[in-house]
Every structure is written in C-alpha cells, then in structure tokens.
C-alpha cells in the first residue's frame, strides 16, 4: 500500500487540527453544567453521554493526518480512564492547551526537545505537590461525597458508598442494566480474578468490549488445552444443553483455540476461554476456590480426571459471567454455601499459621475474593437510552471513588490545578526552552477551571483570576455560581485522577511537539464509473455529471 508523507510545521499543524477537533467535542461536557453529546449508533437508539472517553472513542476524522492527532488525544483519554477511571475530559483539555501553546513556541523557534523536558519536569512537580496536599478518604460520608460528585447524583453516590462498605474497599462492584425504574444495589456471592479473554473474538458486547455469558457452565482445569479432540466430547454435551461455556485453563492454544473462536464467531456456541490466574501451587489453590464457588470439580490428571472423558457433572455454573481484556467476574456461582464457608475457615487457619508476609498477603487476597462477594448496582431508567447513560455514569463514579480511597482527594472544580501554580514559581530553576516548557504547563493548568466556568455560563478568565487569588481549597461551585469552601461543599476530586490527567496530557503533548514527519496510507481514490455511450448527444466518455 502506497504511503503519503507530511513534514515539520505542516505535519504538526495538521496534528493540531485533529487534536482540536476531538478536544472541542469533548470539553463541552466538563463540569456540573457541562452539556451532553449525542453519538449515532449503526444499530439501535443513539447514545447520549457526557463521558469524555466514550465520546473520544467514537471520533474518527476523514483527513488521515488530522486523524493521527485525534487518535493521540484519544490515547490521553483512554490511558487516564484505564488508570484512574475518570478525569478523561480534564486530561483532554490539558493536552489541547499544552499542544496549542507548545506549537506556538515551536513556530517561534523554540527547541521542541527542550520544551518537552520543561513540560515533563513541571508535570512531575505538579503531581508531587497534589499528592502532598491530598486528604485521606476513610469514612462512608466522604466516600459518598466523591461518588456523588462524579455521578452528579446523590442517590448513586449513596449506593456506591453502601456497596463499598459491604464488600470492602478492594471488593468488586459491577454495574448491570436494571429491569425497573429504580437504581438498586444487590450484594451476591461472586469472585473476580485478573485474567481476561485469550482472544478478543470471544467478545459478545462490542460496545463494552466484554464477553457476557448468562446462566453459564464453567470448566475449570489445570491442563493446557491445545488439541480440540480433548474438548470435543464435552463441547458436544454443552451444545445439547444450549448454554454458554466459560473455560478456565492453564492455557488454550493452537487448534483448540481456533475451533472455539470459529464457533464463537459463527454464533454456533457462546464460549469464552481465559487463562488461570497465579502460578504453581497458588494457581491450583485459586482454581480450587473457583471450583468451590461454582460447584465445579477441578479437572486435573492427579485427581483422576481426563479432559476427554468427563461430562457435565464436572462443570460448575454461574448466573452471570463477564470477561473483559483484563478481568473475569463470576456472579452467583452454583456452589454450596457451606463448602465456601469451610474453605474460608481453612484459609483463615493458613493465614494464622503462615510466617511469610507475602504468603499471608496472598492468602488474604483469596479470603477477600471468597468471602467479600460482589456488589451489583442495577441501573434503572425509563428508557434504554437513559439507562445506558446512567450505567456509564455509575461506572465512572465507581472508578473515581476507588481512586479516591487509594490516594486521597484534592479540591474539585478545577481549583486544585489552578491553585497549585505557585509550586512552579521560579520555573523550577530551569532556563531557556525548558523554562518556556514550565510556563506552557502553567498556562495549561487553568484550562479545566476555565471550561468548567464557561460551560456554566460564567466568564472563564474572570473566574480563574478570582480562584487563583483565594486560599487553597476555596473555589467556584459551578452548579450554584457561588464561591465556597470546596471540601465543605463536597466538591472533591480523587488526586489519582488529577495527577494522571496531568501526566498523560504532558506525555502526549511532548510526543506531538517532537514530531517531525507523518506517514499515513494513501487514501484510495474512488474508481471512475464505466464509460457510457449516449445516443442523440454524441458520445460521452468517462463518468457523466
């Protein structure tokens, strides 16, 4: 395939156009008075959302050079969402400001590498300063505050705080679409482990990039499966039952994997394969935990089981299984409660008897998974469109709340970034282009506050000036238009979210500023229509207009 190229200033400006296109679509959602964005879907109703990363993922530009810029900023939003679960719009706004100011300086003759070093140094300093000013989140009321701010709904905030209290801070909280108008919390027996699907072809929910198996059979084995002949007898029995199947094995590869993938793609059978978590003896113990929770028999040669000779009796069951690229969640396993209680008691004894700190930590993790259960929040709404939007908000709020519990909170509403500017006084002792890099970060840090104010109908620059002059933690409540003590008003952001937004924006901006050439595939030109021969008006060659 032929490639086309673009160089230096021309390349960077086309990247900037792409950055602006995506950022302008996303930043209107910032703050409590942010607007919604409607996303067209090929199938079903359109999606209405104010979630930055959801909007960013939908954007593809026709100009291939500009599209590269849009994809780079999409990476900022996605990365921030993956690490902190929120703050995607803030990260996008910061990236846009850093790119704009950076390119202006590059055009004026600044060295991009020097600017990048200055931007990185300033971002690191801001991150350290924010961490130092963070306040721990420990009680239920504080957790509810953080969740309420993220979800912009006090009912959701209370539900998340309740869920965290019941399953523990490290517990699993999942979100499902509800069947009533009310949003409800349900704590069920369940388990989650950090291994995702072996192949993305097992995905059943393209939007969420998840494999969702309802009322599923579960095969748990210590073996590596590579020959389909080993699995075939069992697969045929499961197929007769018309139920989905989750396979947890040391690995599934070769002919076995390709056969499962083909069946999943053809929709002959709903199936998903995941690798077993852990290593060695610990892996075997974790598989035994799963077997007890799901009512399965652990299929292992040393226990007298051969994979090609077992039937449905060795399979466990679960009401629901959700597998994404990183995690597998099993909800409502079909095991006996008494067996699970015995297993929990056994692990507690092992913890007491263990001398190794590491062993105790890993045993405690297994205990939490076995005894904590899974909190399921069912998003209720009057219409499917509203339900999907609410589900998005709840998922964001859960991630933000977990981030707050992990590292603490700072004042929200964009105030923390605007009031952390004194940390950059003296330009960190840097000179030349590195000093300019620090001043670029200084200008960018006010942008989230400016857009929160602007979206709420205020003059952004006037608000920035007022907030920057106030004591730490005092700022604009954009919902009411008043200047308040943000912590007392419950307007807080997880410091992990804010730090990651700054770090990821600085990273992508630095890469973009130091870009000197772009290489993209040459767009295919439309083929000309077949030559037509008209009569009465002479001959017409080529496409007619």
Swiss-Prot record:
Biased composition (Basic residues): 534-545
Keyword tags: ATP-binding, Chaperone, Cytoplasm, Isomerase, Nucleotide-binding
Residues annotated as binding ATP: 29-32, 86-90, 413, 477-479, 493
Start and end residues of each stretch annotated as Disordered: 526-545
Any one biological process term the GO annotation gives: protein refolding
Signal sequence, start to end: none
Catalytic activity line of the entry: ATP + H2O + a folded polypeptide = ADP + phosphate + an unfolded polypeptide
Classification via SUPFAM superfamilies: GroEL apical domain-like (SSF52029), GroEL equatorial domain-like (SSF48592), GroEL-intermediate domain like (SSF54849)
E.C. code: 5.6.1.7
One GO MF term attached to the UniProt entry: ATP-dependent protein folding chaperone
GO cellular component, one term: cytoplasm
Principal subcellular localization: cytoplasm
Compartments, as annotated in UniProt: Cytoplasm
InterPro entries named in the record: Chaperonin_Cpn60_CS, Cpn60/GroEL, Cpn60/GroEL/TCP-1, GroEL-like_apical_dom_sf, GROEL-like_equatorial_sf, TCP-1-like_intermed_sf
Family the entry assigns: Belongs to the chaperonin (HSP60) family.
Task of the protein: Together with its co-chaperonin GroES, plays an essential role in assisting protein folding. The GroEL-GroES system forms a nano-cage that allows encapsulation of the non-native substrate proteins and provides a physical environment optimized to promote and accelerate protein folding.
Subunit note: Forms a cylinder of 14 subunits composed of two heptameric rings stacked back-to-back. Interacts with the co-chaperonin GroES.
Full protein name: Chaperonin GroEL 2
The gene coding this protein: groEL2
């Amino acid at each position: 395939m032929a490639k086309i190229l673009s160089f230096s200033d021309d390349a960077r400006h086309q990247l900037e156009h792409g950055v602006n296109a995506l950022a302008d679509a996303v930043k209107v959602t910032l703050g409590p008075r942010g607007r919604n964005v409607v996303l067209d879907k090929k199938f079903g109703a359109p999606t209405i959302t104010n979630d930055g990363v959801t909007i960013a993922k939908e954007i593809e530009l026709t100009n291939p050079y500009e599209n590269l810029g849009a994809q780079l900023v999409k990476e900022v939003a996605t990365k921030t969402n993956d690490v902190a679960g929120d703050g995607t719009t803030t990260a996008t706004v910061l990236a846009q400001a850093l790119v704009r100011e950076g390119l202006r300086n590059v055009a004026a003759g600044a060295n991009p590498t020097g600017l990048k070093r200055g931007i990185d140094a300033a971002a690191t300093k801001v991150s350290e300063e924010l961490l130092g000013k963070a306040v721990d989140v420990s009680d239920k009321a504080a957790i509810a505050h953080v969740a309420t701010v993220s979800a912009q709904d006090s009912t959701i905030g209370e539900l998340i705080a309740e869920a965290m209290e019941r399953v523990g801070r490290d517990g699993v909280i999942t979100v499902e679409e509800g069947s009533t108008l009310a949003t409800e919390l349900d704590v069920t027996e369940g388990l989650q482990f950090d291994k995702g699907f072996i192949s993305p072809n097992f995905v059943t929910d393209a939007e969420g990039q998840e494999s969702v198996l309802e009322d599923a059979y579960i095969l748990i084995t210590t073996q590596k499966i590579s020959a389909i002949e080993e699995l075939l007898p069992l697969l045929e029995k499961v197929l007769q039952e018309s139920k989905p199947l989750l396979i947890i094995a040391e690995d599934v590869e070769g002919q076995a994997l390709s056969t499962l993938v083909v069946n999943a793609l053809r929709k002959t059978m709903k199936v998903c394969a995941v690798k077993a978590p852990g290593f060695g003896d610990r892996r075997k113990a974790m598989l035994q935990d799963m077997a007890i929770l799901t009512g399965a028999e652990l299929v292992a040669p040393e226990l007298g089981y051969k994979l090609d000779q077992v039937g449905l009796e060795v399979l466990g069951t679960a009401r629901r299984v959700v597998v994404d690229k990183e995690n597998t969640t099993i909800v409502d396993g079909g095991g006996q409660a008494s067996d699970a209680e015995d297993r929990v008691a056994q692990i507690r004894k092992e913890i007491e008897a263990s001398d190794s700190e590491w062993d105790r930590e890993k045993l405690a993790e297994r205990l939490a998974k076995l005894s904590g259960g899974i909190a399921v929040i069912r998003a209720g709404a009057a219409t499917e469109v509203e339900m999907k939007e609410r589900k998005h908000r709840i998922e964001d709020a859960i991630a933000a709340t977990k981030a707050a519990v992990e590292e603490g909170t700072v004042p929200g509403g964009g105030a923390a970034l605007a009031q952390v500017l004194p940390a950059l006084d003296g330009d960190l002792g840097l000179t030349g282009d590195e000093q300019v890099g620090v001043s670029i970060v200084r200008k960018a840090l006010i942008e989230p506050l400016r857009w929160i104010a602007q979206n709420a109908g205020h003059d952004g620059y006037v608000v920035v000036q007022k907030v920057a002059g106030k004591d730490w933690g005092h700022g604009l409540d954009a919902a009411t238009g008043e200047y308040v003590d943000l912590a007392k008003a419950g307007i807080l952001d997880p410091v992990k979210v804010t730090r990651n937004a700054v770090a990821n924006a600085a990273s992508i901006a630095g890469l973009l500023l130091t870009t000197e050439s772009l290489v993209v595939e040459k767009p295919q030109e439309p083929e000309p229509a077949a030559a037509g021969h008209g009569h009465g008006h002479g001959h017409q060659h080529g496409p007619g207009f």
